[in-house]
Each structure stands twice: as C-alpha cells, then as structure tokens.
Amino acid sequence: MIHFTKMHGLGNDFMVVDGVTQNVFFSPEQIRRLADRNFGIGFDQLLLVEPPYDPDLDFHYRIFNADGSEVEQCGNGARCFARFVRNKGLTQKHKIKVSTSAGKMTLRLERDGGVTVNMGVPILDPAQIPFKAKKFEKTYLLQSAQQTFLCGAVSMGNPHVVLEVDDITQAPVADVGAQLTRHERFPKGVNVGFMQVVAPDHIKLRVYERGAAETLACGSGACAAAVVGQLQGKLGSRVRVDLPGGSLTINWEGEGKPLWMTGPAQQVYDGQIQL
C-alpha cells in the first residue's frame, strides 16, 4: 500500500509521494493509470520525493507527466513539494534546498502559506533549451501548418515557447498548442504559452503543457512568459501573471540573474492506494 497526498498549485494538480520513508517505484503504465481522472486518482503530474543525492541538499525529487514521461521542472510542483515535506515532518526548515533533473533550487516557505521558489537563471541559449536556431534572438519566427508565429523561446529547466495574443480568451490554445508542442525545432518537445500583455507589470497567460495539454496553471510557463515579455521590452522586472487557476508573482532583474516565483500551494487530501 502506497501513501500519497493530493495537492494543487492554482488548480495544477499533483499526486505527491514520499519516497524517503516508503520504497516506491512507478512504471509509465502505472502513472498513466493513476493519472486517469475517471478510473484513477487524477492529476497533471506525479511528484516523487527522494533522499538527496548531494549532502549539501535536503531532498531530490522527480516529476512525471500524466502520460508517464519524466520531465525536468515544474514550478507549481516545486511549491507543492515544499509544502508537502514541511507538512509531513520530513523537514522543519523554512528554506529548503532541493535538486531535480534540471538542477538545484531553493524554496522558501512564506508566513502567509505561499511558497517562493528560486527558479534559477533562465536559459536563453537555443542549444541548451534545446531549440534549433543559429543564435539567440529576442523574437523568433516559427512556421507550422502554413502559419508563421512570432515567439520567444526560453528554458526554465524545461523548454518553453511564448506567443503574444491580443485576447487570451480567444487564443487557439488547443489547436496551435498541439501543433507546436511537437515542433521539429524543439527536439525534446516544448510547453507552449499564450500571453496577453495587460500592462508592464501584468499579463494573462494560458499554457499548453508538453505531455499534459492545457492546464489551469503552469509555474515555469509563467516564468518563461515574464522573461520573454521583459526581453522584448514589454514587461518590467516584477510581473503579476494571471492564469486560469489564479495568480503568481514573478521577479526577474534581467539576463544572468535568477528568477523568483511566488504563489500558493494547497493540500487537498491524503490517501493510500494499492498498485
């Protein structure tokens, strides 16, 4: 029997499993079955908490999409992870150092129940995103299905492409998102963000996530949109990002500097399941 906790960050929901005190393994098939909202638990991603690989860190954790694929980063998941390890008594710290396959992060639990995540320095080099382009540009041309899109590309530990739209409610998220998420210029696939700029400190955003379709919120997508908007001269260093599930605050002082994301993390229930 495996004990788990259902959590969400702005409606982006997770099955969180303690792999520190439990011996657990999930196959891609098991994850797909558990993620099914009709016949399983239902979630966007599974978070597996593990002991640290580095003695200077507190934990390592792994992130799996609903389709069973393992991914590098998840901003909303990072906040839920931090709240989970504190709630379950796995740590008493307010400042938690962790690693994922994308690298190291620092998480800070706030007094109001929110969590601030140091998401690291945004990766702009196309080769490291990875994105097939000759050199870094603030705006790229991306062609798909006889359409041409103006976009920005960045990695927050996972690849993102961001398109600006006039009206977020009319954005072709499902159609264009499905086209671009597997675009040949992104060898590992890509998360697709649709951004409406409201003011220099305020955007609205919808994200088609790689391996999960559109979700209510995407933390790393919010970070990517803030970066692209600032690089293109449309946004300042502090931005409120409104997603379908709620709002995040992003702080970024520019190229070469780490980006900070602040937002909520909520526990829904504890459960146990036989695999």
Curated annotation (Swiss-Prot):
InterPro entries: DAP_epimerase_AS, DAP_epimerase_DapF. GO terms for cellular component: cytosol. Pfam families: DAP_epimerase. It is an enzyme of class 5 (isomerase). The active site is at 74 (proton donor), 218 (proton acceptor). The record marks 160, 209 as: Could be important to modulate the pK values of the two catalytic cysteine residues. Its main location: cytoplasm. The record marks 269 as: Important for dimerization. GO terms for molecular function: diaminopimelate epimerase activity. Keywords: Amino-acid biosynthesis, Cytoplasm, Isomerase, Lysine biosynthesis. It is found in: Cytoplasm. Pathway: Amino-acid biosynthesis; L-lysine biosynthesis via DAP pathway; DL-2,6-diaminopimelate from LL-2,6-diaminopimelate: step 1/1. Substrate binds at residues 12, 45, 65, 75-76, 158, 191, 209-210, 219-220. GO terms for biological process: lysine biosynthetic process via diaminopimelate. It catalyses: (2S,6S)-2,6-diaminopimelate = meso-2,6-diaminopimelate. Its EC number is 5.1.1.7. Belongs to the diaminopimelate epimerase family. Homodimer. Catalyzes the stereoinversion of LL-2,6-diaminopimelate (L,L-DAP) to meso-diaminopimelate (meso-DAP), a precursor of L-lysine and an essential component of the bacterial peptidoglycan. This is Diaminopimelate epimerase. It comes from Shewanella amazonensis (strain ATCC BAA-1098 / SB2B). The gene is dapF.
